[in-house]
């Protein structure tokens, strides 16, 4: 949590697709249902996000392309909000909640945004975020994150060799525990850390 009790939530960020709305209007269960309904021409859409996931998987009848695109839209809007957060906070990103089960359809568009470019007026391009973004769910990328880019440099103050991360990096990971369990584990670890500092 932050100094004022904020938990690092980005739901109130500006929505990249609908700039007058908050990000949660495109990054939520209801957003997946709305996006699917719009693409499939179903109004009102009474399906659940799980139904739409099953359609995307091909295990339920429906418009597979619309189902995949509805999750991709979520990933794109979430990616923009996450990019803004990563521009200010040097950390890792954990995707959680029930919708995380659809990560195979969410992560590609999210990673595309996070690995994208932004331009200046003169056409000069910059990486969307300063860090190299690794997909923790991909074994090769996980190994590269864990094993690559480290080198030793000599400290100008002590003269000792110290480890140096030559590439700024972060990960995008999907919670396997669910939001409640992950929150509980984080709170427990936070409490233990503070107890250690007080003893």
Give the role of each language-model region.
Residues 2-16:
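A short, polar/charged loop-to-alpha-helix boundary motif
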Residues 14-199:
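ATP-binding/phosphotransfer module of carbohydrate and carboxylate kinases, centering on a glycine-rich
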């Amino acid at each position: 949590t932050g100094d004022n009790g904020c938990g690092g939530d980005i739901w109130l960020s500006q929505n990249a697709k609908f700039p007058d709305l908050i990000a949660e209007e495109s990054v939520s269960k209801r957003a997946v249902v709305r996006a699917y309904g719009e693409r499939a021409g179903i109004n009102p859409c009474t399906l659940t996000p799980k139904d739409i996931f099953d359609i995307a998987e091909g295990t339920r009848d429906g418009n597979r392309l619309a189902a995949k695109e509805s999750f991709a839209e979520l990933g794109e809007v979430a990616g923009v909000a996450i990019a803004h957060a990563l521009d200010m906070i040097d950390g890792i990103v954990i995707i959680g909640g029930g919708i995380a089960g659809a990560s195979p359809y969410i992560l590609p568009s999210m990673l595309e945004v996070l690995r994208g470019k932004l331009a200046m007026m003169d056409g000069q391009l910059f990486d969307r975020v300063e860090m190299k973004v690794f997909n923790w769910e991909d074994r090769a990328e996980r190994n590269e994150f864990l094993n690559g880019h480290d080198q030793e440099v000599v400290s100008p103050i002590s003269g000792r060799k110290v480890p140096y991360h030559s590439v700024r990096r972060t990960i995008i990971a999907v919670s396997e525990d669910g939001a409640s369990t992950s929150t509980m584990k984080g709170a427990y670890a936070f409490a233990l850390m503070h107890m250690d500092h007080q003893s």
